[in-house]
Amino acid sequence: MRKKVLISGAICVALCSILLCGCGSASAESGSGSGITITNVSYDPTRELYAAYNDLFENYYEGEKGITVNVIQSHGGSGSQARSVVEGASADVVTLALAHDITLIEEAGLIKPGWIDEFDRQSSPYTSTIVFLVRSGNPKNLHDWNDLINEGVAIITPDPKSSGGACWNFLAAWEYARRNISEDEEAIKDFMAALYANVTVMDSGARGATTTFVENGQGDVLLAWENEALQTLKEYPDEYEIISPSVSILAQPSVAIVDENAEKNNTADIAKDYLEYLYSEDAQRLIGTYGYRPSDQSILQEFSDKFDLGMTLCTIDDFGGWNAAYDIYFKDGGIFDEIYER
């Protein structure tokens, strides 16, 4: 396999940890008229969503409870963000790309066991899936996963070692191969090795991968969160197309209170209110507007013209849940490493 370009998120994570630690301990206390500040450590492509949601929540909370709230956002590759919290970033809440990243914070003693049942729908207020973003006219004629292994196709995808979206990308491709090529693991590995041989750049997070594809003009196809692809179409309506592969995956980002930090910062109640409000009708409609699939199925149907609701989607349960999937595919020495090092 030829050498890839790997862009590390380590520097970004270190800076994020320093900045959030510096502001977190003093930020969350309610002062005389100064209100309350909480920090949301999130994954890469949620910047626009949470900028809008924070305004919605802040206005709601001041109107309902007379309390001024300021929400600080932090964004990066989901795995890197989880590690930054473990290493000291003072997050009151985390809104990450996959449950396993929150489990890492739980295992560090910062989040109480049972967090996945604290909020509705397994603490997943919105979902997404994985699609292909191609240039207008689809010049390489890419329609499904098997087209991505063709000679001369340049793929852009983030690195599963730092990006939650990249893990969803990998699993969606794996499930396609299992259903359409062979159930034999070695045959699936061969397919995945051919696919990753065509990856030319691996950024540390989904937004970085989008920048590589869109701003820098590299690659023929971006393996993208559906919401990120929709955002790109909104910004560049005549330059790109979304391709829905025959098989993808129901990506379920997760949210949780970072209990130890929230208790220390005296923000536990408002942190809970902040995450609960994601399930309100107003927030669910905002979520749909920003290209995420509302977890409220009735509101999701209001966006049926925006999302391809007929896609065949596997789920993380098809891989035994996130803890099992992470150990098999993404831990050091796992299947991803085996494939990538071929």
Task: Please annotate each region the language model reported.
Residues 41-43, 134-135, 153-181, 195-199, ...:
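Short beta-strand->loop
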Residues 54-63, 86-90, 99, 106-110, ...:
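Sec-exported extracytoplasmic/periplasmic mature domains
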Residues 1-37:
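Short, low-complexity disordered leader/linker segments with a strong preference
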